[in-house]
């Protein structure tokens, strides 16, 4: 139980997991937790991970908003109405009452989190690619976009570990191809692209909040399901 709680805590604190340049390999049944997650005690106790993610998304949104304002204001105004409501996040009911939390399963929670995480990896790869095209995009903005993408991929790896540990299931991580990194269908209209990026970040922030809630529910259920609310 102690080892499992360590894994749960590590996933909740996913920014300190190994990055995409050092993928996790926990396929061996004999692999210990320490082999799967190389993490110091100080980082393990860092409880600011999700607030860091949230603030990073807000940072990106604010900077993309600045990019929009750098472009023609009249052009933006003519398109704003149809773009602001373009958010399409995953329809996923979040259990809220004590009875709902008791009725769901760990499997449902884990696969719901994995679905949300994997649905955003390629859109964020695309976002990183489009950011490079903006004349007004600073190095800080580009680095922050890369950071968010890397942490999302680390989170996916952490959830895969949990599924292996708790459900004894093997699942595949997302494969990012060269076409994803350098898409050929980039929109020639920079204004449209900036507005799409802003809408994408708005959607991602909503789903990131869902991911945080579901992982906290999972941790709570594993500790004391009948008093979890």
UniProtKB/Swiss-Prot annotation:
GO molecular function (one): growth hormone activity
Quote the subcellular location field of this record: Secreted
Q: Which cysteines are joined by disulfide bonds?
A: 26-36, 87-203, 220-228
The cross-references to Gene3D superfamilies, in alphabetical order and at most eight, read: 1.20.1250.10
Arranged from A to Z, the UniProt key words for this protein are: Disulfide bond, Glycoprotein, Hormone, Secreted, Signal
Q: Which GO terms describe its biological process?
A: animal organ development; growth hormone receptor signaling pathway; positive regulation of growth; positive regulation of receptor signaling pathway via JAK-STAT; response to nutrient levels
Is Transferase set as a keyword in this record? no
Q: What span is annotated as the signal peptide, if there is one?
A: 1-21
Q: What is its main location?
A: secreted
Q: Name one Pfam family in it.
A: Hormone_1
List all annotated glycosylation positions.
Answer: 143
The UniProt entry, under InterPro entries, shows: 4_helix_cytokine-like_core, Somatotropin/Prolactin, Somatotropin_CS
One Gene Ontology cellular component annotation held by this UniProt entry = extracellular space
Q: Which tissues and organs express this gene's product?
A: Pituitary gland.
Give the protein family. Answer: Belongs to the somatotropin/prolactin family.
Q: What is this protein called?
A: Somatolactin
Q: Which organism is it from?
A: Tetraodon miurus (Congo puffer)
């Amino acid at each position: 139980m102690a080892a499992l709680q360590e894994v749960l805590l590590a996933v909740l604190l996913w920014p300190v997991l190994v990055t995409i340049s050092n993928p996790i390999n926990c396929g061996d049944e004999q692999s210990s937790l320490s082999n799967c997650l190389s993490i110091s005690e100080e980082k393990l106790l860092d409880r600011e991970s999700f607030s860091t993610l949230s603030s990073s998304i807000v940072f990106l949104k604010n900077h993309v908003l600045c990019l929009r304002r750098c472009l023609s204001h009249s052009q933006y105004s003519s398109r704003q109405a149809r773009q602001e409501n373009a958010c399409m996040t995953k329809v996923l009911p979040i259990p809220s009452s004590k009875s709902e939390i008791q009725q769901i399963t760990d499997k449902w929670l884990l696969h719901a989190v994995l679905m949300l995480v994997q649905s955003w990896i390629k859109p964020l790869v695309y976002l990183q690619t489009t950011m490079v095209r903006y004349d007004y995009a600073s190095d800080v903005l580009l680095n922050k976009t890369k950071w968010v993408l890397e942490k999302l991929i680390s989170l996916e790896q952490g959830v895969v570990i949990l599924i292996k540990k708790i459900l004894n299931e093997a699942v595949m991580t997302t494969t990012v191809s060269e076409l994803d990194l350098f898409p050929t269908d980039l929109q020639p209209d920079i204004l449209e692209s900036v507005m799409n990026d802003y809408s994408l970040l708005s959607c991602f922030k909503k789903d990131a909040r869902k991911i945080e809630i579901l992982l906290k529910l999972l941790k709570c259920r594993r500790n004391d399901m009948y008093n979890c609310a």
